[in-house]
């Protein structure tokens, strides 16, 4: 799932900047998400990226199961390099923005990470976490672009199409992994019950 809302959501590209916490609305989102996730029959582990906004989102989810939030750097936001902290209204005017939207597989952020490297990192992290909890139910709190990239990979969709996926703050995306191909159970879920969530 994606972290909750912050004071800069939709305004700047925060990337991996430290010290960005959930807003009051973000904390409320996290509590509602924790209530929804509590509907699941089991949760074996809760992971988050090292950033404050993901850890704060994960805390109520873990607390409901008396679990500790485990940190995995593979769940980090894309490294936006020199673009970190810049206003989105400024970035959207750059010619590179069109590449990011339509051919992200060809783009590397100046001084930062490529979208391909980000996708490889998040997929590797999820594989590693799954190996630690075979057959388990695990909640991973991450960031919009890594989640979208992971969904694209699970669907077998080219990375250049991943911007067609929407991942809202505190939305839940569920993927079932078994012996065959991954099965995407839900994407960007913000309100429906999770109680019956399972592969058909």
Regions found by a protein language model. Give the residues of each.
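Phosphate-coordination/substrate-recognition cap region in phosphate-metabolizing enzymes
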Residues: 31-98
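Active-site signature of alpha/beta-hydrolase-fold catalytic machinery across serine-
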Residues: 60, 149-153
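Short basic (Lys/Arg) and small-residue
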Residues: 143
């Amino acid at each position: 799932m994606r972290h909750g809302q912050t004071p800069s959501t939709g305004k700047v590209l925060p990337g991996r900047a430290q010290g960005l916490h959930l807003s009051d609305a973000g904390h409320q989102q996290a509590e509602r998400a924790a209530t929804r996730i509590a509907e699941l029959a089991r949760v074996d582990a809760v992971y988050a990226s090292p950033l404050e906004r993901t850890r704060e989102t994960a805390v109520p989810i873990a607390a409901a199961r008396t679990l500790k939030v485990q940190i995995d750097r593979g769940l980090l936001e894309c490294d936006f390099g020199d673009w970190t902290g810049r206003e989105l209204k400024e970035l959207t005017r750059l010619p590179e923005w069109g590449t990011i939207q339509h051919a992200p597989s060809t783009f590397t952020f100046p001084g930062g990470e490529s979208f391909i490297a980000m996708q490889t990192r998040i997929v590797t992290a999820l594989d590693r976490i799954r190996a630690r909890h075979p057959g388990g139910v695990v909640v991973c709190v991450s960031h919009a672009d890594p989640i979208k990239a992971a969904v694209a990979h699970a669907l077998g969709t080219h990375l250049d199409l991943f911007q067609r996926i929407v991942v809202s703050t505190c939305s839940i995306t569920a993927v079932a992994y078994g012996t065959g191909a991954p099965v995407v159970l839900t994407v960007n879920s913000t309100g429906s019950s999770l109680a019956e969530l399972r592969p058909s």
